[in-house]
Amino acid sequence: MFKHTLGAAALSLLFNSNAVQASPVPETSPATGHLFKRVAQISPQYPMFTVPLPIPPVKQPRLTVTNPVNGQEIWYYEVEIKPFTHQVYPDLGSADLVGYDGMSPGPTFQVPRGVETVVRFINNAEAPNSVHLHGSFSRAAFDGWAEDITEPGSFKDYYYPNRQSARTLWYHDHAMHITAENAYRGQAGLYMLTDPAEDALNLPSGYGEFDIPMILTSKQYTANGNLVTTNGELNSFWGDVIHVNGQPWPFKNVEPRKYRFRFLDAAVSRSFGLYFADTDAIDTRLPFKVIASDSGLLEHPADTSLLYISMAERYEVVFDFSDYAGKTIELRNLGGSIGGIGTDTDYDNTDKVMRFVVADDTTQPDTSVVPANLRDVPFPSPTTNTPRQFRFGRTGPTWTINGVAFADVQNRLLANVPVGTVERWELINAGNGWTHPIHIHLVDFKVISRTSGNNARTVMPYESGLKDVVWLGRRETVVVEAHYAPFPGVYMFHCHNLIHEDHDMMAAFNATVLPDYGYNATVFVDPMEELWQARPYELGEFQAQSGQFSVQAVTERIQTMAEYRPYAAADE
């Protein structure tokens, strides 16, 4: 019924390209003299723990559209990407930001499992953008391919399946060579999937009340209160001012009861070693439970007093304040370059994150629990096949994977993986002067092993669930195992240090299918498929909700998209 626009030459490249295995490549290692040293803060001093923790608002759909194929609802949203200013320092000038709906972080999506969504991202900013719903098994055309940009004055409709189990996803910019600056200035937000199975566990709940988003970033400011740009940075942008939900070093009033915290490291380059401490004994780490990681709940809670989290990782923890009534608890960040695992520069105050002021009593009894059994995690079937090897390093000034940069269009496709295949990938960081959080699009993976490393760190107990990002510390090798399903297409994998990503530490893999796969596959294989490209718009039409933004036009557009059945394979 529908024709694809993928040319013969492109099809040949996708289905016949040979994977490039890891081989020795020239590497230049930066000096490591800064490790384990604390240096003076460069940004102006900020009055810590004086501003309450902000909670991003919940995004509401503009309308619902009936799917003509199955009769189910599709929720339609509009998000305007636009510049705005924000008074960060109370006694200095404002900072120039660009955010989703003119806020940073962007609004939080809360979507029930099984409800498809179409989100129209409208670029009313000055720079191109591309949006990645991180952790979703979106079709390639809606996955935020780095070159699939939306220019200013255009919009793109992203169609999301929301078929996965409950989990904390996030959406952020992914535009070629400008992801760091776009995300740094505000283009990031949470996208939460919910489902009845998780709700039935009776974990601490109530968004913004006892279920708290915690989006971590690290920035740097000029003497007048504006942001220092990331442009021109080639190694890492650490930042010396820690933010939670866009606010430097906030505080939160809490009750002496259990709270669920959804941590996301949305920083450009900074990783964290998070722990809770009583201000009466600041060097003593308090126990808490990790209940979920990138791809949803663990099988069992993991008890710990220290949580390593790198860029793009998500962890959900439950901390019980009931033993600390009337006290002050701080969330802290481990110094010494995160215990020697990281290479981050420690500034005067980057060991502090935020403060919790615990009330003397609860307003109502705490009936929430943390069950010993959270769920049966759908791990991929084990494989004994030889792992593919991918070496993350540096070739001259360029960050590369197996010596290949993303700008090398002819060679950046490093793997062809038949849909439905389980594979092990060996991720290698031979460098001593950098670390790499590695994100593989489309899939959830199991962390099988972690070896070598300067600290002999193994797989942490809270890494026992499914993930989509794994942190490669200095000189570490990590093996991950994933089921490459449910969709064919060309997808990215890359380092999520956004400076490294922007400077080409990114590659592609092709989840392949036979030509007679049996349903409308090829129209979604190419992430640059013309059918789904961004479209120009008139600002007046958007503001008046007319033309392409009228209810009739939006309904027709979404129903046409649904007729292609982009997510039919997930139901088979």
From Swiss-Prot:
Class of this enzyme: oxidoreductase
Glycosylation sites: N510, N520
Repeat among keywords: yes
Keyword vocabulary terms for this entry: Cleavage on pair of basic residues, Copper, Glycoprotein, Metal-binding, Oxidoreductase, Repeat, Signal
EC number: 1.3.3.5
This protein's name: Bilirubin oxidase
Binding site for Cu cation 4: H436, C495, H500, M505
Domain Plastocyanin-like: 98-194, 404-526
Family stated for the protein in its record: Belongs to the multicopper oxidase family.
